[in-house]
Amino acid sequence: MCSISFVNLISMSLSCFLLSLYFLLNDMIYFIEWELVSLNSMSIVMTFLFDWMSLLFMSFVLMISSLVIFYSKEYMMNDNHINRFIMLVLMFVLSMMLLIISPNLISILLGWDGLGLVSYCLVIYFQNIKSYNAGMLTALSNRIGDVALLLSIAWMLNYGSWNYIFYLEIMQNEFEMLMIGSLVMLAAMTKSAQIPFSSWLPAAMAAPTPVSALVHSSTLVTAGVYLLIRFNIILSTSWLGQLMLLLSGLTMFMAGLGANFEFDLKKIIALSTLSQLGLMMSILSMGFLKLAMFHLLTHALFKALLFMCAGAIIHNMNNSQDIRLMGGLSIHMPLTSACFNVSNLALCGMPFLAGFYSKDMILEIVSISNVNMFSFFLYYFSTGLTVSYSFRLVYYSMTGDLNCGSLNMLNDESWIMLRGMMGLLIMSIIGGSMLNWLIFPFPYMICLPIYMKLLTLFVCIVGGLFGYLISLSNLFFLNKSLFMYNLSTFLGSMWFMPYISTYGMIFYPLNYGQLVVKSFDQGWSEYFGGQHLYQKLSMYSKTLFLMHNNSLKIYLLLFVFWILILLILLFL
């Protein structure tokens, strides 16, 4: 089933890519209307939107999905339910495609809910307590976005149709459209895990690694960014854009800090995804939708490769994800290490790799844009933190001696997994320049002073040095000492967001509920209610029973008494 799915998806991806080129070069947009029901004067029509953006994004989703399924053939080889896993992944891709090509909020909701439901099934795929908790957190966080989307559908009743794309430009200054835009922004923030909904993204790492490669690169988390790209007119012309810029900037800063304190391999990569999502959202809130789309596509390539390499390492390490137990992997797994380092360098923005073209352009656009000092600081500091945790990860996993058990057989003989990774490796090297020429056919002239041009390079070098220094033992133990304990706990736990969004949200309602139960249900209500009445009746019946047993005279007297009462009632 893996091979059939791979061939079908890769051929569909190629078709979508060629179509997107045709649409882009000829500046074409197609609306396809499909009439579902026609009854007298009423008709229900489903509309699909095909333009270069939707087709290109769809081709990337299909390509990454095909390589992930091909990779899963070996990664999930020993799993008894691999066919169920492949079916869930295909359902995931189908939901994503429905969301991409829909200009209608109702059909978007179908794809949106499909993503939420299937992602829950995939997160709890390994059935244990940790997976169930992570799945519940994921489902409930995304449910807030579903409610926001339903409310926006209700608001759109004012327009008589749910095809939002027809009304965005004309109605952009109206209160109703502003309300719809704010609700859609809330939905996108939950799906793309922006502050204060960030805690579910690292928790979702309980899913199998191929799912992480698909979900955290090109599908679930980017659905929110893609939706806001479609609603960009409202963001860029109202206060919503300023709010989004602040929240997304704080998200990428928080995720970058958290990744420097994390030791779980998959969680570090998940936090790097969160940081890049914040970068996409922030540049989108400034009105540069093509640039956000460009970074979304390049990020999908190297992040999927990074997760695949992490999966191969975990597979060889007997399911151990602690980076402190790794070391010297470049000797034992040279091909996987090469792919891992290329994807890490692309994430840092190494010149002429996929991430460089989008990240460098974003930072230069920020430098010439009218943003305040706080946002400017967040952009550049977050870039430095990205390089820092990437170099820290390379230091822990690739250098030094192997720290795991001596019985671990580390090798690079997983040829099916390696082939899947090689396809993405090529795209991670050439994808950035290829997309740059496609999306921006005429180069931008960005004229900046030399110190502003070199600021990005300087921040990256400082970040790399900091990542190396933070890994050294003396700094590490100082950081974990009681002197720095509170600060490192705060920064390493995503500013306590997982605790606030789980324990913090339910603590007071549960305590109040317990008080109500103790005071009423198990207190005076219990005394004056059923239990007290039951006890009294039991006591009286026992007393009467004893009286009947002990005295024949009383028994006969009561018998006569009840006969008299019955006769009186009978003749009244």
Curated annotation (Swiss-Prot):
TM regions (residue ranges): 4-24, 44-64, 86-106, 107-127, 147-167, 170-190, 217-237, 239-259, 268-288, 294-314, 337-357, 372-394, 422-442, 457-477, 490-510, 552-572
EC number of the protein: 7.1.1.2
Keyword annotations from UniProtKB, A to Z: Electron transport, Membrane, Mitochondrion, Mitochondrion inner membrane, NAD, Respiratory chain, Translocase, Transmembrane, Transmembrane helix, Transport, Ubiquinone
Topological category with respect to the lipid bilayer: Multi-pass membrane protein
InterPro entries linked: NADH_DH_su5_C, ND/Mrp_TM, NU5C-like, Proton_antipo_N
Record's subcellular location: Mitochondrion inner membrane
GO MF annotation terms: NADH dehydrogenase (ubiquinone) activity
One term under GO cellular component: mitochondrial inner membrane
GO-annotated biological processes: electron transport coupled proton transport; mitochondrial electron transport, NADH to ubiquinone
Matches recorded under Pfam families: NADH5_C (PF06455), Proton_antipo_M (PF00361), Proton_antipo_N (PF00662)
Annotated catalysed reactions: a ubiquinone + NADH + 5 H(+)(in) = a ubiquinol + NAD(+) + 4 H(+)(out)
Similarity field: Belongs to the complex I subunit 5 family.
Described purpose of this protein according to its UniProt entry: Core subunit of the mitochondrial membrane respiratory chain NADH dehydrogenase (Complex I) that is believed to belong to the minimal assembly required for catalysis. Complex I functions in the transfer of electrons from NADH to the respiratory chain. The immediate electron acceptor for the enzyme is believed to be ubiquinone.
Name of protein: NADH-ubiquinone oxidoreductase chain 5
Source taxonomy: Eukaryota, Metazoa, Ecdysozoa, Arthropoda, Hexapoda
Gene name, Swiss-Prot/TrEMBL: mt:ND5
